[in-house]
Regions:
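Hydrophobic core of transmembrane alpha-helices in multi-pass small-molecule transporters
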Residues: 110-130, 344-359
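Helix-to-loop junctions at the C-terminal end of transmembrane segments
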Residues: 70-83, 170, 306-319, 400
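Intracellular juxtamembrane helix-capping segments at the cytosolic ends
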Residues: 126-140, 357-372
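Extracytoplasmic gate region of multi-pass secondary transporters
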Residues: 38-42, 162-173, 242-296
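C-terminal ends and interior cores of transmembrane alpha-helices
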Residues: 92-107, 328-341
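Cytosolic juxtamembrane N-terminal segment immediately preceding the first transmembrane helix
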Residues: 1-27, 31, 47
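Multi-pass alpha-helical transporter architecture, strongest
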Residues: 216-223, 419-442
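Central cavity-lining transmembrane alpha-helices of secondary-active solute carriers
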Residues: 58-78, 297-309, 388
Length: 442
């Protein structure tokens, strides 16, 4: 009896989905890499092109704008064809976007890089819209949230690798001249340093493009499970009306927007936050940036460990209740980030990652409960909610560019936005818990 219970998470009707699960789970690590090699690039591009934090944050606008633009086209595509086809198209666009970094570097301008990011994340949108519900379908509905949490547990491993590569193969190898020094360069000196820095920046993207192509061909030639039902008829508007009438889905999309915004803000602007704190303690700017990225890696390790721990705890707790507890804890740590103007504020910012670990897949799993084959469109709505990562970081960057807010360092004050996000998440967790209690009683 116990053995059957252990096998059930990756089995359905006596069929094991272990190999497909492993292959699709590898994609979770791949988009984690893309996300977290990109977050530090806001600061890097700002320095390379001598721009403000707000202009640098356009990287996040392009990056998460691609998610938003392709979510429903991806859903229509996988409804017409299959999850596997969606995964393959996503990998193809991911690789193409990564390879576009080379012509962008040859142009030597900022905006071609934004186009490359946009195309890359159009691929990620296809990949996530396909992979998340694909994982949910590889077993029974009762174990779907646990299965997705397990798959999502490998996402931060890719994120850790992305952070490590960003720190050691991009940030540490950029020209060490600080922001003030770059501002005083002549035009010819600026161009020479910019060309060198861009050459450093593009190499990891070209390499990951080759890795993506390898995964593409492995999945292409592997037998994968088909969609639960073949339905080439697209009832787009009626399906959307149907799923958005469900409170748990409608509120889930709204909440996911704020969660992704909080995650990207915390992981992007830890560089600015840490740099300010460490320079205040006498560290040089380039050293402060690299050290801040080390704190970001610690945050991701904490995120990764917490994901596995919370996935286990989820076996014994109501998903909404655990989500609410983690959101309240995240809000408390964010309050510390705002109020503390020393290294303890940075410690609080690192601790926030432990609280965020379970949020994305838990919100995702709760929102898609009971949607059946409509989960293809439901997943698209949740992927569109990743737009929060495009909208909210530029707002935070604009606050940071103010330098001071009500006598407080603007970097600290800017974290009021993630705090608000955690309040929204806590409310969703609470309402989910109430709905679960209502079902038990009713």
């Amino acid at each position: 009896m116990e053995q059957k219970k252990k096998e059930s998470i990756l089995m359905k009707d006596g069929v094991s989905y272990l190999v497909p699960f492993i292959l699709i789970t590898s994609c979770f690590a791949l988009w984690g890499f893309a996300n977290d090699i990109t977050n530090p690039m806001v600061k890097a591009f700002s320095k390379i092109f001598r721009m403000s934090s707000t202009d640098g944050a356009l990287v996040q606008v392009a990056f998460y704008g691609g998610y938003f633009a392709m979510a429903f086209p991806a859903a229509i595509f996988i409804r017409r064809f299959s999850y596997k086809a969606g995964v393959l198209l996503g990998l193809g666009l991911y690789a193409f976007g990564a390879f576009l970094f080379y012509p962008a570097k040859m142009m030597g301008e900022y905006y071609p890089f934004l186009l490359a990011y946009f195309i890359l994340t159009c691929g990620l949108s296809f990949l996530e819209t396909s992979s998340n519900p694909y994982i949910l379908s590889m077993g029974t509905e009762e174990t779907a949230t646990r299965r997705l949490n397990l798959a999502q547990s490998f996402n931060p491993m890719g994120s850790l690798l992305g952070m490590y590569v960003a720190m050691n193969f991009i940030q540490a190898k950029l020209n060490p001249l600080d922001t003030t020094g770059r501002a005083n360069l002549s035009a010819s000196e600026f161009e020479a340093i910019k060309e060198y820095d861009l050459s450093v920046l593009i190499n990891p993207y070209l390499i990951i493009g080759l890795v993506i192509l390898t995964i593409f061909f492995v999945i292409l030639f592997t037998k994968m499970p088909k969609n639960s039902e073949k339905d080439n008829k697209i009832n787009f508007v009626p399906t959307l009306r149907h799923i958005f009438r469900m409170p748990h889905y409608r509120e889930g999309v709204f909440t996911q927007f704020f969660y992704v915004g909080a995650q990207i803000m915390c992981w992007t602007f830890i560089i600015q936050y840490g740099t300010r704190i460490l320079m205040q303690e006498g560290m040089a700017e380039i050293d402060a940036e690299v050290t801040s990225q080390k704190f970001n890696i610690v945050a991701m390790v904490l995120f990764c460990c917490s994901r596995f721990i919370c996935t286990f705890i989820l076996r014994f707790f109501n998903a909404g209740q655990l989500l609410m507890i983690l959101a309240i804890a995240g809000g408390c740590f964010t309050a510390g980030v705002i109020a503390l103007h020393n290294i303890w504020g940075l410690y609080c910012l690192v601790a926030v990652s432990a609280c965020m670990s379970l949020m994305f897949p838990t919100i995702y799993g709760i929102a898609l409960r009971g949607l059946g084959d409509d989960a293809k469109f439901g997943a698209a709505g949740l992927i569109m909610a990743i737009l929060g990562g495009s909208v909210l970081p530029p707002l935070q960057a604009s606050i940071i560019d103010m330098h001071t807010v009500f006598g407080m360092p603007s970097t600290n004050a800017s974290f009021i936005l993630p705090f608000i996000c955690f309040v929204v998440i806590a409310i969703y967790g609470y309402r989910t818990k109430l709905r679960s209690i209502g079902k038990l009683l009713g």
